[in-house]
Amino acid sequence: MYYAHIRWDDRGAAIASQTVAEHLSGTAALSRAFAEAFGAGDDGELIGLLHDLGKCTDGFQNRLLRDGPRVDHATAGAVACSKYYGRFEDAACIAGHHSGLPDFGNVRTDCAGDATLYGRLKKGIAEKYLESCGESGMTLPDLPRAAAQPDRLCASFRTRMLYSCLVDADFLDTEHFMDGDRGRGGYDDIPTLLARLEKYIAPWQNPQNELNRLRCDILNTCLEAGAKAKGLYTLTVPTGGGKTVASLAFALRHAAVHGMQRVIYVIPYTSIIEQNAAVFRDILGAANVLEHHCGVQLDLSDGAPPEEVCRALAAENWDIPVVVTTAVQLFESLYANRSSRCRKLHNLANSVIVFDEAQMLPLPHLRPCVAAMASLTAQFRSTVVLCTATQPSLGDLLAAYAPGWPVEELCPQTAALYERFRRVTFRREDALEDSALAGRLGEHRQVLCIVNSRRAAQRIYELLPREGSFHLSTLMIPAQRQAFLHKIRERLRRGEVCRVVSTSLIEAGVDVDFPLVYREMAGLDSILQAAESKGRCAG
């Protein structure tokens, strides 16, 4: 009998055991279910069944039962996968299920025992590993040898997705044996969340003025568009048009119609994430929304409240109906090789992914970002929505990476809406010294100044009167920034003195409304985004 895990009591006595066959079967079932979301269930099951084949050795059993030296238990399954099934990418998933996806290396020059995948595969495999599976009552699937994937970028994304399925399944099956029920799941399903949203917006359906009528039209257009086919979409809504709730309406309806797993919002700034996540929690219930970025504290300690533990567990694999995260978190995971980063990836498949403030995608990395979006749609059955008031021109790039997937606008009356939502006039000023600019700002009771650097923002702020003046930058911790934004909104609402100097963090979707905005010269998209802070709530 070969064991995969032993549970010990505080005195070091074994109190429960899980055989290799039990662990492989449990992992394979989960991995298959995860991979079914993008049509790779057979591969998901195969890598689950083979991943811990190397535990069927005296060396590993000595390690497990008598704290012997470490042994490589991942390579055996990788060799079996490559040798008997010809599935090289699947073998990579198995080889790296603890240490991370390995560098493939060079088939001609790598030697047996090298750390590359080719080097590890050349170590060979003893037939007794497979014999041990048979002795344990396990049956390996009868699958044909895999054909090579001609597109290497597509192959890399598929490999990471399958790797994610295996890593998450392995963690979950092991966790279930070692710790029992830790409180994962228990979320409301997508149809329930859609019904909750529809109830929330029902009072809005009798607008009392022209602007609210337009907002209702946008909302209802997005809700109806949710029945459209999966694909690539843009949502171009002018400032003040209510795109946060409108995009959520599309996403939930679309997910409900197509049986999709979740809605994921990708947002450039944590200040906007905090704002939008608060809206989503208010509508859908806090237990159904995960806010995941570097500023969120996650607590898995024994004394943590159950809701905090549930949130921390959801952050490990994004197994929750609504995720609000950063572009950095998403794209770094899509191009990562570490198990902790990749674990969540399979939950991007068959999901609605909304890129809010899409104009903020980083220009130096635009091609890999767009390639990932295209792959999520074309390979992994997801729908991608680019949502902003200032839509970037990504059509050619998307067409190159996802041929045959046209990009469709969800709100086709965009041009007319911009005219009807026009609430801002622009005027170019001559260059001003810091002191002169501070003097101009001091002449107004309520004014916002946006500059291009943190250093400039600090200099100008220090020249303003202390009473009613605020300075915002990305160096602030989230709690401090949110406290300042709350004070700013309250002072604006009460008509009190409120002068704010900020970097560009405030111009992309932060919900504030100033009568006057100064914007240091920048790209046209930044200037238009700055205009969002004036006239946002007009009407």
What is each stretch, according to the model?
Residues 260-283, 293-296, 393:
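Conserved Walker A/P-loop ATP-binding site and its immediately adjacent core
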Residues 65-75, 469-482, 487-489, 497-539:
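Conserved RecA-like helicase motor core of SF1/SF2 enzymes
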Residues 389-442:
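Interdomain hinge/linker at the junction between the two RecA-like core domains of SF2 helicases
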Residues 6-10, 291-303, 452-455, 469-486, ...:
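Conserved helicase motor
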Residues 285-335:
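Inter-Walker segment of RecA-like/P-loop motor cores
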Residues 1-199:
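Accessory nucleic-acid engagement/destabilization modules that flank
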Residues 229-251:
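Walker A/P-loop
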Residues 262-273, 440-465:
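Conserved strand-helix element at the start of the C-terminal RecA-like helicase core
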